[in-house]
Amino acid sequence: MNLANYFPVLLFILVGIGVGLVPMFLGKILAPSKPDAEKLSPYECGFEAFEDARMKFDVRYYLIAILFILFDLETAFLFPWGVALRDIGWFGYASMVIFLLEFIVGFVYIWKKGALDWE
């Protein structure tokens, strides 16, 4: 077993670590830093970070999270469909068109109901 064969792998790992760490250190060293109380305070979704954990907050955050999950799942279904489109033929194409139409109808419904308005 010749360890010289593993040199490119070691070099690849070292370059990858360097690409990740060098910009961080350069930014830390070269970037201007003028911290004040406002910049050092934690920001969490527009609320004070150190309040009661059981405080009420707007239900629209839940709605946006649910909508994000739904459209994220739609994207998760679209990728394998696009990869296998040649193999599944017209039936697969038609079923995905129906799937997308259902999502479009649902999106238009929540849009018309005003669920996306942040007023």
From Swiss-Prot:
Q: Which reaction does it catalyse?
A: a quinone + NADH + 5 H(+)(in) = a quinol + NAD(+) + 4 H(+)(out)
Under InterPro entries, the record lists:
NAD(P)H_OxRDtase_bac/plastid, NADH_UbQ/plastoQ_OxRdtase_su3, NDAH_ubi_oxred_su3_sf
Q: Transmembrane segments in this chain: where?
A: 7-27, 63-83, 88-108
**Location(s) in or outside the cell:** Cell membrane
A GO cellular component annotation here is: plasma membrane
Please indicate if the UniProt record lists Secreted as a keyword: no
Tell me yes or no: is Cell inner membrane among this UniProt entry's keywords: no
Pfam families from the entry? Oxidored_q4
Keywords, alphabetical: Cell membrane, Membrane, NAD, Quinone, Translocase, Transmembrane, Transmembrane helix, Transport, Ubiquinone
Q: How does it sit in the membrane?
A: Multi-pass membrane protein
Describe the protein's quaternary organization and the partners it interacts with.
Answer: NDH-1 is composed of 14 different subunits. Subunits NuoA, H, J, K, L, M, N constitute the membrane sector of the complex.
Question: What name is this protein filed under?
Answer: NADH-quinone oxidoreductase subunit A
